[in-house]
Amino acid sequence: MSGILLFIGIILLVIAIHDFFFTTLSGSGTGFVSRNISILSDKIIQVCVKVFGQKTYNYNGLFVNLMILFSWLLLIWGGLFLVFSSNPEAITNSSGKVANFWERLYFTSYTLSTLGMGDFTPSTAIFKMLTGAFSFFGFIFFTSSMTYFLSVASALVNKRTLSKSIYHLGKTPREIAKNILNFDSSFTYQQISELQNLIDKHAVNHHAYPVVHFYRQSKKRDSFSINIARLDEAISILLYAEEENKYREELKVLRSSLSDFLEDMEKNFASNLLIQKNAENSYSFPTLHSKDDEKELQKRRNIVQGLFGSENYTWDDIFNKS
């Protein structure tokens, strides 16, 4: 028995299984493997965008998800294959002949797929138990993966609903601010409350299923980063305007929800965002006298600019109708 193959196989299995269950069941983000595969996949998409254009973003989330699934399969398949290969006589065919390299690879694949053809069998009690355990794991793997992807799809629907809600509220920050003030008061209160609920829900989904971050769209009007930036700037206009408005307290609560989301973005997606230290000053606010307020506003603009900058947008896209 080859101890090196056995050791490497076990290490690969432990890494893959931990990453799989942490990502799909913990609701606390992604494992080390999934996180790095996501970052790498996104960088590949960014290269493709330069070659094929913005339409490539329509495949961003799909590509990241498939790459994560492929990495899990590859690690588990490879790890189990190495464990079986650690003992050349572990797997035999129906005639008792020892399986060769390709036959062990085939046996590993149909063990994980729970196919159970029966033309190859493990020869020892330990490998029989191992085969049974990973046949059961294969069933859990595919059902848990589908459940996870359904949860991601639900989170994606909420993200796009939020983006659409902001877009229909106004096409520029000033238009959003103007509409909030000019709408019927009961409708405005309702809109602020609904936006807060959608943002809070998206923040929770974003933390539980970080892959949602990578689902982008090619059209500017549908871009989540564009619309969330416009909303944040609109709230800044309303909160730092010289004129008082009756929605100030409600807007502060909405602002707080946005702040939590932006902080999570900065903490967990800094490598995917083009965050700069000094974002462009889009507006000057006469009532913004506090240094702390200036720093807070600059910080959130840096994060927001990093968000839409990662999709090759600029502040001009935020302030111009699309």
Give the role of each language-model region:
Residues 13-38, 231:
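Short, non-transmembrane cytosolic segments of multipass membrane proteins
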Residues 18, 34-45, 102, 106, ...:
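Membrane-interacting alpha-helical segments
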Residues 27-51, 161-171:
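Membrane-interface amphipathic/juxtamembrane segments adjacent to transmembrane helices
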Residues 47-65, 119:
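Cytosolic juxtamembrane amphipathic/interface segments immediately preceding
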Residues 60-79, 224-228:
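Transmembrane alpha-helical segments and their cytosolic interface motifs
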Residues 158-227:
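Non-transmembrane accessory domains of multi-pass membrane transporters/channels
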